[in-house]
A protein has these predicted regions:
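Extracellular glycan-interacting surfaces
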Residues: 1-365
């Protein structure tokens, strides 16, 4: 049975598909903000990251698809060295504090999980979330000092992509701090934003790799050298595992937050366009999905089943997902609307208009 987990401002929704229709099976953590959920197919565990305001970031794990939960320690920074001063580029203090879990991905080793956070820390667990270690190779990199917040006060790691054939190769995305790449399993890191550009910076820093704002980076599982990035200033494609990027002319807009890569067809990807910067609404107040099937040379604008009048839904960076077949997609919006398609995006069905604001969606086959 196909299953979809929807993370929202007011809980985690588990949906199941019976034939062509999705229905809500269970709601967990009602009233609590759930930033992400991750299913680990290796042992059937489901993880949920919560943000409880004054009580901080929490992590939960379920062994029965959400019927019951246990608490795990949340990733946390080590104690900041006495007398050490860490500041953002604007001179404000940079506290060693996890403000949100913003990326969760299974690793290659037994019990290995990677976690990116708002706060800028990259963490790794080797015991299925029982404990977490800060990845010092990235945190101690001198270029990390150039990162700054993109929509939040602190920088955040939102995308983690592990090469399926060589888990030593890891690509991640930072808002705002560019794309980064490790080829030794996280021991050392290098900037990997060549080809991206930042129109929000002075001209002399437009191409600076350390201050780029990729909103989301994803990879084609079957052809892992092909990656896609939805950036603040455009859409980019990499053909060399993220080492370099080329700009693409998507329509009706190159701005947005989400991008999804077809799992087996490297030339196919989907975007959810929006208008930057002050408005942040769909172009012409019409919700559409843009799809390319020729590596970004041309784009189809898909709108059947999506609202085309006075629609002000924004789809956040983790709120678009594609399943292992490459045919089923789901996306959720800031207004609590959830849509699904079973034909690659040609036609969409509204699953609900009444959910809380949606942060993330993720399929489980």
């Amino acid at each position: 049975m196909d299953r979809l987990f929807v993370s929202t401002r007011k809980g985690l929704f588990s949906l199941v598909r019976d034939g062509s229709w999705w229905s809500i099976e269970r709601v967990s953590f009602v009233g609590d903000a759930v930033s992400l959920a991750m299913f680990d197919a290796r042992d059937g565990s489901l993880y949920a990251a919560l943000g409880l305001g004054h009580f901080g970031v929490k992590l939960r794990r379920s062994r029965d698809l959400g019927a019951s939960w246990e608490e795990l320690p949340a990733p946390a920074f080590p104690k900041q060295p006495e007398g050490a001063v860490d500041t953002l580029p604007d001179g404000k203090p940079w506290p060693w504090r996890v403000e949100q879990v913003w990326a969760l991905e299974p690793g290659a080793g037994p019990g290995e999980i990677w976690c990116g956070t708002v706060g800028g820390g990259l963490f790794r667990s080797r015991d299925a979330g029982g404990s977490w270690q800060l990845v010092r190779g990235l945190w101690d990199h001198p270029k990390r000092k150039e990162w700054f917040g993109g929509g939040a006060d602190l920088p955040g790691i939102h995308s983690l992509s592990i090469h399926p054939g060589d888990p030593r190769q890891v690509v991640l995305g930072v808002s705002c701090g560019g794309a980064w790449r490790s080829e030794d399993g996280g021991d050392t890191w290098a900037l990997s934003s060549k080809g991206m550009f930042a129109e929000y910076m002075p001209p002399q820093r437009r191409d600076d790799e350390a201050i780029q704002d990729p909103h989301r980076i994803v990879r084609c599982a079957a052809h892992p050298e092909r990656l896609w990035a939805q950036h603040h200033n455009g859409v980019f494609r990499s053909d060399d595992g993220g080492r370099s990027w080329v700009s693409l002319d998507a329509r009706p807009s190159v701005f947005g937050f989400a991008v999804a890569a077809h799992p087996t067809q490297p030339d196919t990807a989907w975007l959810v366009p929006a208008v930057k910067d002050d408005e942040r609404v769909p172009p012409e107040a019409r919700v559409v999905v843009s799809r390319t099937r020729d590596a970004g040379k041309t784009w189809e604008v898909l709108r059947r089943g999506l609202p085309q009048t006075h629609a002000y839904d924004i789809v956040y960076r983790h709120a678009l997902d594609v399943d292992a077949t490459g045919q089923r997609l789901a996306m959720g919006s800031t207004t609590g609307s959830l849509w699904a398609t079973g034909d690659g995006g040609d036609e969409w069905t509204c699953v609900s208009n009444h959910l809380p604001p949606i942060y993330a969606v993720r399929f489980v086959a």
